[in-house]
Amino acid sequence: GCGESATGLNKVGQKVNLFVTDPQGPETDQMYKPIPFFMSNRGYGMFMHTSAPVTCDFGATYIGLNKMFMGDENLDLFVFFGEPKDILDEYTDLVGKPGMPPLWSFGTWMSRITYFSEKEGYDVAANIRKNKYPCDVIHFDTGWFDVDWQCDYKFSENRFQNPQQMLKDLKSQGFHVCLWQLPYFTPKNRYFPELIKKDMYVKNGNGELPYEDVVLDFSNPE
């Protein structure tokens, strides 16, 4: 349980921090997608209904003793009992059941950090098909913008001469294309001044900018 992590699926002996952060690689115990839910082979599962940071200590401090710390004024817990499939069924009855992803998403994805140009994308696709490797997705990571890692949702005009045609060509070869995106904008990003001016960024509890970068507020009707 507890969401995406590069650590072992069995959490016994681990201390897990459930808070969205950039893990800076798989060598840390931080995570992009924490989920405040876990199951035990002792026949129970627990969902922590909070958006606050949570720490679950599964015997890391004291063997055989589970502890939980929640940064919230209220403790709102749901406890489920039964077989794992029954626990998952009850949990998803509560929070919602996921839809089945398309079949191609379970196929092979080809990527690295990072393909910087249209030519690289074409070359990778050609080599895959030439060598008859099964592949469904080509993923362009952090380098498809003008400045690496600074997402502005626009292909670099210097390195991607005709991205629309590239997408069509790759589709005709049987590839889906995935583009790395992140809704944060550094002060050097061309959209940063506009987001500040239009008040379209996520604020902290004091109504202030919590970090140097801004995170796009998708709840803003504008």
Where are these regions (language model features)?
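Aromatic-lined carbohydrate-binding/catalytic grooves of carbohydrate-active enzymes
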Residues: 99-222
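Catalytic and substrate-binding clefts that recognize carbohydrates or anionic sugar/phosphate headgroups
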Residues: 1-102, 112-113, 118-119, 125-130
